[in-house]
């Protein structure tokens, strides 16, 4: 939904409105979407959080660029806010797919406290949204786990030179190529071909 104060992030909710109209787009819940839900719930007077937790949620969101997103949200009319709210609340934490006989688990940050025997539905949202896996982290042997949240520049401690590239460690694939960094760019993984695409 947002990151920092850059002009390109001032229209995060406009982008979500566009995405909500596209049946071919599946948006997974990320930590910024979760922060927006918590903060906007509190700011709108919803009783989803206690007062102390609500104030903490707003501070956390604002520390992560939420002020710019709040201004964008406030520009929406009531119908657009309903669409956004429904879209945010419907975002899944993960998506399992099979493409060309390859199994994939797509999620935002990874799986904290991972065990291959642990059912996915037993992971708390925070274990998926805020996970920062180590570079040598592996997950399942029978499927690819594709995630972002941790820019590859941080995952590799900046040891890679040149423009950022999608990071692979066995079946664990980090596609966050750190657009916010000078060496960053948008990294996409084509599940049909397993080829990297960069913008």
Roles of regions detected by a PLM:
Residues 98-101, 190-195:
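Short acidic-glycine loop/turn motifs at beta-strand connectors
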Residues 156-157, 188-190, 198:
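DEDD superfamily 3′-5′ metal-dependent exonuclease/proofreading module
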Residues 182, 196-199:
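Alpha/beta-hydrolase fold catalytic core
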Residues 3-95:
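Active-site neighborhood of divalent metal-dependent phosphoester bond hydrolases
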């Amino acid at each position: 939904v947002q990151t920092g104060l850059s002009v390109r992030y001032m229209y995060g909710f406009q982008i979500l409105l566009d995405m909500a109209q596209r049946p071919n787009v599946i948006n997974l819940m990320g930590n910024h979407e979760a922060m927006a839900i918590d903060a906007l719930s509190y700011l709108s007077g919803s009783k989803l959080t206690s007062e102390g937790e609500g104030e903490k949620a707003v501070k956390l969101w604002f520390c992560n660029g939420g002020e710019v997103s709040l201004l964008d949200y406030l520009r929406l009319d009531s119908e657009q806010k309903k669409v956004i709210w429904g879209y945010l609340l419907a975002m899944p934490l993960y998506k399992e797919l099979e493409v060309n006989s390859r199994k994939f688990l797509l999620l935002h940050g990874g799986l904290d406290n991972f065990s291959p025997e642990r059912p996915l539905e037993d992971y708390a949202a925070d274990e998926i949204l805020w996970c920062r896996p180590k570079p040598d982290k592996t997950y399942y042997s029978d499927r690819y786990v594709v995630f972002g949240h941790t820019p590859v520049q941080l995952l590799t401690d900046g040891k890679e030179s040149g423009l950022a590239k999608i990071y692979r460690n066995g079946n664990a694939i980090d596609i966050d190529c750190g657009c916010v960094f000078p060496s960053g760019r948008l990294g996409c993984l084509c599940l049909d071909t397993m080829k990297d695409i960069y913008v």
